[in-house]
Amino acid sequence: MSRAAFDRWISGLKPTGIEVIDGLRRAQAGKLDDADVKPGEAIRFGGYGEDRTLYTQTLFAPEGEEPRTVHLGIDVFAPAGAEVFTPLNARVHSSRINDNPGDYGPTIILEHTPVSGLKFHTLYGHLDRDSLKGLKPGTAFRAGEKFAELGTKRENGGWTPHLHFQIILDIGSAKGDYPGVAKRSERDHWLSICPDPAKLLGLP
């Protein structure tokens, strides 16, 4: 799918009132490496295009290679157990438990076709394991329907509880996983196929 077609669609998208996580539109924005949110506190979000220093695991920085530090999605920090809702009508593309240290943990990728000829995917990382139980490719969800919950640090790849939300215009052959962090030298390429999700999430 072309970036131009997506940009035309997203530019005309009207607010839906749907929040991927309850309270997102009242959330605090900011540069985030880590943000522990307790129950009852305002949730926090940020991270698209950030060049981050916290990715020290071998997954992101193999010895002798350029590290991956540029974040390709938006992180929404909320307590473990927070419900996750799809922003658009969707079908399950794939799911997987990515259990390397620092990885996504339980992950779901949804497929969206909001208008004829336009198809893209959204990735939801750091979920709880129960979110994947009984989930099959092709399972349909209506816009605003709950389909997952955030996982604890023990099951979400070792991170403070949060949702990694990412738009993917070119999924290729990927299933249940997709790069969420890019090398600086490849920044422009990856940001072109993983555009800023802010408008889809109803954020400024």
What is each residue range found by the language model?
Residues 71, 112, 126, 162-164:
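Histidine-centered active-site/metal-ligand motif
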Residues 86-131:
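Zn2+-dependent peptidoglycan hydrolase active-site motif and core
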Residues 2-17, 133-155, 159-204:
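Acidic, glycine-rich catalytic/binding loops that coordinate metals and/or anionic ligands
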Residues 65-101:
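Short, glycine/small-residue-enriched coil/turn segments at secondary-structure junctions
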Residues 1-75, 79, 186-204:
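Polar/charged, compositionally biased leader and regulatory segments
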Residues 74, 106-108, 161-163:
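Short beta-strand micro-motifs in enzyme catalytic cores
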Residues 77-78, 127-135:
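Short alpha-helix capping/helix-loop boundary micro-motifs
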Residues 76, 90, 110, 144, ...:
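Terminal peptide-recognition signature
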